């Protein structure tokens, strides 16, 4: 059995770590709430522009933008949204597993893969795993700006317009609730009709100045807004996952301290018993 002094040292060390994890949990709670507010603020725009684009796709306007035309898939692009920091449980690993599974399906069909990686963890993963990373950005901070993302997104959009990729996906975590974050792979382009929103309103649209000018700008904004929303939502997922991870670490530290305290008490009791026995034995010898 370890000595009392050694056990006291371990208890002190774990208590110090527990204070750190407890503080990190509280910080994550605060950051998660702010991220949720940003996520909620961006959702109406992202959802509304998706509805408008969906209606345009279903309505089959005279001008068919390349983003709305299906073609044979020879090369696939993924915009991967990961975190810059760790200590958030299996958030990134679960996301990468979903991505690798989806990539494997296309590779089996003979398609090549191009990657645009957002976040340091994604860049680190693909350095080890391998992959053709054509664009990367990291350290966007707690309040990412859409302007910071435009350059990397444009690389993938230009590749699609030039025929270098035939399908583009965004891969990120969806915020279900504080306890649940779901990795998702969503197709950005070509646009697919949303059956849930199909012709809810049988409206006819008049395009000014014309459908081509409208769609050329609107579709690019659509992709940018979806990627931005994915980044904001992934940040909320990161903070929620970190909060849970730090809470579990704090609770585990408490249990470990209790176990060590019990061991310490037993060791101390054994030492006292031994001292008493030695005193009694010495007195008897006298």
UniProtKB/Swiss-Prot annotation:
Keyword Kinase applies: no
CDD domains registered for this protein in UniProt: F1-ATPase_gamma
Disulfide topology: none
Membrane disposition: Peripheral membrane protein
Gene Ontology biological process terms, A to Z: proton motive force-driven ATP synthesis; proton motive force-driven plasma membrane ATP synthesis
Pfam family, one: ATP-synt
InterPro entries: ATP_synth_F1_ATPase_gsu (IPR035968), ATP_synth_F1_gsu (IPR000131), ATP_synth_F1_gsu_CS (IPR023632)
Main location, first listed in the record: membrane
One Gene Ontology term of the molecular function aspect: ATP binding
Similarity field: Belongs to the ATPase gamma chain family.
Summary of subunit composition and partner proteins: F-type ATPases have 2 components, CF(1) - the catalytic core - and CF(0) - the membrane proton channel. CF(1) has five subunits: alpha(3), beta(3), gamma(1), delta(1), epsilon(1). CF(0) has three main subunits: a, b and c.
Free-text function comment from the UniProt entry: Produces ATP from ADP in the presence of a proton gradient across the membrane. The gamma chain is believed to be important in regulating ATPase activity and the flow of protons through the CF(0) complex.
Name this polypeptide is given: ATP synthase gamma chain
Species, as recorded: Pseudomonas aeruginosa (strain ATCC 15692 / DSM 22644 / CIP 104116 / JCM 14847 / LMG 12228 / 1C / PRS 101 / PAO1)
Gene: atpG
């Amino acid at each position: 059995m370890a000595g009392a002094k050694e056990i006291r040292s371990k208890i002190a060390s774990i208590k110090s770590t527990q204070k750190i994890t407890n503080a990190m949990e509280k910080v994550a709670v605060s950051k998660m709430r702010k991220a949720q507010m940003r996520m909620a603020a961006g959702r109406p725009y992202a959802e509304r522009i998706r509805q408008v684009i969906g209606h345009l796709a279903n309505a089959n306007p005279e001008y068919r933008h390349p983003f709305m035309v299906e073609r044979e898939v020879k090369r696939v692009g993924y915009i991967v949204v990961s975190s810059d920091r760790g200590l958030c449980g299996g958030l990134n690993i679960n996301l990468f597993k979903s991505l690798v599974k989806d990539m494997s399906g296309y590779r089996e069909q003979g398609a090549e893969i191009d990657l645009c990686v957002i976040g340091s963890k994604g860049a680190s993963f693909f350095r080890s795993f391998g992959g053709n990373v054509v664009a990367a950005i990291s350290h966007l901070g707690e309040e990412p700006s859409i302007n910071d993302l435009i350059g990397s997104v444009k690389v993938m959009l230009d590749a699609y317009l030039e025929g270098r990729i035939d399908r583009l996906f965004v891969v990120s975590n969806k915020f279900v609730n504080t306890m649940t974050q779901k990795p998702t792979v969503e197709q950005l382009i070509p646009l697919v009709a949303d059956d849930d929103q199909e012709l809810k309103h049988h409206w006819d649209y008049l395009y000014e100045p014309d459908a081509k000018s409208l769609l050329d700008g609107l579709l690019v904004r659509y992709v940018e807004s979806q990627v931005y929303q994915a980044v904001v939502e992934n940040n909320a997922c990161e903070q929620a996952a970190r909060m849970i991870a730090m809470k579990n670490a704090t609770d585990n530290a408490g249990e470990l301290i209790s176990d060590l305290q019990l061991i310490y008490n037993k060791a101390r009791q054994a030492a006292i018993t031994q001292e008493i026995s030695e005193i009694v034995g010495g007195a008897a010898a006298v």
